[in-house]
Amino acid sequence: MAVVSVEELVVDPPTAARRLLGATLRSGQVAVRLVEVEAYGGDAEGPWPDPASHSGRGRTKRNAVMFGPAGYLYVYLSYGMHTCVNVTTGPDGTAGAVLLRAGEVVDGLDVVRGRRPTARTDADLARGPGNFGTALGIALDDYGTALFDPAAPIRLELADPLPAALIADGPRVGVSSEADRPWRFWLPSSPAVSAYRRSPRAPGAATVRAPR
C-alpha cells in the first residue's frame, strides 16, 4: 500500500476521479476496489462549473459537504431508494465530488452476497451506483464521514496511481446536461464495470474513448 493522504484529492474532479481508480473503500467487514467512477464539478462561480452536478446551482443543505474539504462522504438517495456514494474533492470551499459507480468485492464476499441476493454473478455485486452502496451497507446516516480518519467506520485507502494506459474515459451515465463531457473513468479490464446508458433527454451522440 502506498503512503498517501487526502491531499491527493485536493485537485480538480477529473484528476481526483482517475486517482480513485484502484482504491479500496472499507465499511465493516466489506472492502470494495473501485473500478468505475464519475467526476462532478460545482456551481458557475467555481473553477469547474457543472450543470449536471448536485452543486451546479449553488450550496444547499443536501449538497453542503461537496463545498467542504476533500475526502468526505457525500451520500444521497436516487429515485428515493438507491443509496449513491460520492467522495468529495478539491480545496475547502470549492464544490466537487466523484460518484463511485462500480467496484470489485475484495473482502466480505459472503456478507455482500447476503445483501445482494439477486446478483447473478460476483461481478454484479457492486456494479452500478445503487448496488455499490448496498454492497457496502452505506446509508444516509453516513453522510459526511471523514474517509481518511483511521477511526471512521468507513475508510478510503488509495493505491498506487494507475498508468493512464489502463484507464478509459467517456461521457457520464444518465445525465442530460453536459452529456458528452468525458468525466466517467473506468478500468476496462474489470468485469464489474457497468454498461453506458445515455439519458434520453441528452442531445446528440456520445463518443467513448478507449484507454490511452
UniProtKB/Swiss-Prot annotation:
Domain of life, per lineage: Bacteria
Cross-referenced InterPro entries: Formyl_transferase-like_C_sf (IPR011034), MPG (IPR003180), MPG_sf (IPR036995)
Coiled-coil boundaries: none
Cysteine disulfide links: none
Entry annotated with the keyword Hydrolase: yes
Gene3D superfamilies from the UniProt entry: Methylpurine-DNA glycosylase (MPG)
Keywords: DNA damage, DNA repair, Hydrolase
Bilayer-crossing regions: none
Pfam families membership: Pur_DNA_glyco
Enzyme Commission no: 3.2.2.-
Top-tier EC class: hydrolase
Keyword Hydrolase: yes
GO biological process: base-excision repair
Single annotated GO MF: DNA binding
Family: Belongs to the DNA glycosylase MPG family.
Name this polypeptide is given: Putative 3-methyladenine DNA glycosylase
Organism: Nocardia farcinica (strain IFM 10152)
Lineage: Bacteria, Bacillati, Actinomycetota, Actinomycetes, Mycobacteriales
